[in-house]
């Protein structure tokens, strides 16, 4: 009888990527198939996030709901992974002794061995170590699910912003080798993926090793990814302003596959608060980078993260943030009320901004962003936009839905054979969370460029594998 696996995922896109890899890994090693609910599973994994307030308590509340499942089915395996697991470690077992597995973001590749240890008689297994990039060497070939895919190119962050737990939960920055990244993307392109989203906690800081030992910068990686036939769109997240350097800005002039959308978290528009956060830049430096980018891509859509009510934030500091929002003209934000993260330097500061003030400021910020977003969307009416068709519309399953380069959902009438392809549409109407359009051109009329076939990259990787004598051979594909 097929064993069932249930994974509950909280948090960022990196966690979503990790959960997909866990599922693929346990399918390839143990034959686990996906369960639709925790009740029908043989293994339950909770992939946690420590960014939001009271993340630890949220984990234990969820585990409490699963405790009865363990009582009814003693052979059930319950595991906790992700950033809270990395932070809490043994504490999870102390508070929830029925948990069998505790593993960090960098040790998910060891899940098959951990499960085998439990089946061999171990009472529990805990591994929250940081074995750098090892996990990517142990993961199975990626499986595409639709025309878009995430690809992790690096892990961790070395910036140590005073409010952030990432360096403590995912470790410092470690980049995957260039060939490994290109192979994964080529494999996905061979399965029909058209758009890749390159992931990392500080993705612009990518410094991957080339086959000859030299280092590849992020801008150089973008060129290599864009050259793969079938990959016609490139997104990436998350970035840090300090690492958003001129060579990356220049890439927007030479790489048409880079979409007209950038998510570049600034957190605050106040230099005083930015200094307290240890962000390493000023508001003026940030705006200068955005001006350079807009000279190359005048229509680029910009989004950001904002922390509201950081310790010591005054009315003047908040007004500086509002001024920055207007100057940059964001049309989307991920904004959060500040709450201390245990173990971070900011947690020792006095949280002197009242909850009422935080909520008022958050409302004003989101109101301004919404106004700007609506204005930008209205300006798109009558324009022609290229859409990657992702599938049926959520609003009307008889219609299709896709995204523009600037990450807006467009619903339109089309045929099922358009799914996975690009279409050009004329934008006819604007709604709160979507646009409406009419198809004017299909992909066969676009003349999308071809540079390097996915098959040639995969063939090169296979040719580089050592023979029986341990000697690697290379012949051009």
Swiss-Prot record:
GO terms for molecular function: 4 iron, 4 sulfur cluster binding; metal ion binding; N6-isopentenyladenosine methylthiotransferase activity. Its EC number is 2.8.4.3. It catalyses: N(6)-dimethylallyladenosine(37) in tRNA + (sulfur carrier)-SH + AH2 + 2 S-adenosyl-L-methionine = 2-methylsulfanyl-N(6)-dimethylallyladenosine(37) in tRNA + (sulfur carrier)-H + 5'-deoxyadenosine + L-methionine + A + S-adenosyl-L-homocysteine + 2 H(+). Residues 3-120 form the MTTase N-terminal domain. The keyword Cytoplasm applies. Keywords: 4Fe-4S, Cytoplasm, Iron, Iron-sulfur, Metal-binding, S-adenosyl-L-methionine, Transferase, tRNA processing. Residues 378-441 form the TRAM domain. It is found in: Cytoplasm. [4Fe-4S] cluster 2 binds at residues 157, 161, 164. GO terms for cellular component: cytosol. Its main location: cytoplasm. SUPFAM superfamilies: Radical SAM enzymes. Residues 143-375 form the Radical SAM core domain. It is an enzyme of class 2 (transferase). [4Fe-4S] cluster 1 binds at residues 12, 49, 83. NCBIfam families: miaB-methiolase, MiaB/RimO family radical SAM methylthiotransferase. Catalyzes the methylthiolation of N6-(dimethylallyl)adenosine (i(6)A), leading to the formation of 2-methylthio-N6-(dimethylallyl)adenosine (ms(2)i(6)A) at position 37 in tRNAs that read codons beginning with uridine. Belongs to the methylthiotransferase family. MiaB subfamily. Monomer. This is tRNA-2-methylthio-N(6)-dimethylallyladenosine synthase.
């Amino acid at each position: 009888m097929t064993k069932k696996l249930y994974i509950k995922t909280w948090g960022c896109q990196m966690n979503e990527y990790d959960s997909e890899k866990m599922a693929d890994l346990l399918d390839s090693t143990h034959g686990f198939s996906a369960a639709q609910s925790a009740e029908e599973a043989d293994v339950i994994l909770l992939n946690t996030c420590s960014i939001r307030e009271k993340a630890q308590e949220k984990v234990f509340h969820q585990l409490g709901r699963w405790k009865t499942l363990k009582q009814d089915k003693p052979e059930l395996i319950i595991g906790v992974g992700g950033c809270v697991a990395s932070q809490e470690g043994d504490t999870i077992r102390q508070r929830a002794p029925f948990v069998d597995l505790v593993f960090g973001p960098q040790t998910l590749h060891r899940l098959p061995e951990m499960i085998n240890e439990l089946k061999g008689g171990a009472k529990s297994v805990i591994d929250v170590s940081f074995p750098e990039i090892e996990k990517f060497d142990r993961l199975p070939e990626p499986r595409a699910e639709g025309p878009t895919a995430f690809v992790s190119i690096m892990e961790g962050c070395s910036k140590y912003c005073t409010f952030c737990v990432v360096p403590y939960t995912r470790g410092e920055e470690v980049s995957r080798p260039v060939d490994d990244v290109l192979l994964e993307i080529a494999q996905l392109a061979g399965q029909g993926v058209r758009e890749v989203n390159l992931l990392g906690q500080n993705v612009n800081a990518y410094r991957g090793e080339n086959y000859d030992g030299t280092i590849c910068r992020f801008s150089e990686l973008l060129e290599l990814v864009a050259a793969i036939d079938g990959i016609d769109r490139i997104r990436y997240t998350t970035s840090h302003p300090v690492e958003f350097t001129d060579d990356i800005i220049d890439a927007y002039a030479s790489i048409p596959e880079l979409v007209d959308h950038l998510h570049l978290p600034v957190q605050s528009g106040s230099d005083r608060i930015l200094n307290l956060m240890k962000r390493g830049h000023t508001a003026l430096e940030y705006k200068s980078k955005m001006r350079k980018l807009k000279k190359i891509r005048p229509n680029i859509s910009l989004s950001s993260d904002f922390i509201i009510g950081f310790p010591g934030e005054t009315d003047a500091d908040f007004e500086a943030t509002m001024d920055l929002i207007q100057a940059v003209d964001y049309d989307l934000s991920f904004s959060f009320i500040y709450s201390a993260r245990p173990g971070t330097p900011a947690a020792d500061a006095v949280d002197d901004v009242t909850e009422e003030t935080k909520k008022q400021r958050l409302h004003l910020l989101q109101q301004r962003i919404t106004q700007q977003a609506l204005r930008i969307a209205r300006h798109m009416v009558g324009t022609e936009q290229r859409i990657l068709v992702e599938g049926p519309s959520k609003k009307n399953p008889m219609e299709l839905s896709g995204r523009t380069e600037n990450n807006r959902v467009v619903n339109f009438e089309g045929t099922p054979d358009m799914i996975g392809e690009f279409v050009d549409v004329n934008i006819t109407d604007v709604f709160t969370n979507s646009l409406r359009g009419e198809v004017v051109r299909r992909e066969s009329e676009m003349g999308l460029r071809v540079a390097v076939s996915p098959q040639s990259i995969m063939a090169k990787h296979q040719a580089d594998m050592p023979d029986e004598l341990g000697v690697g051979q290379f012949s051009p594909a």
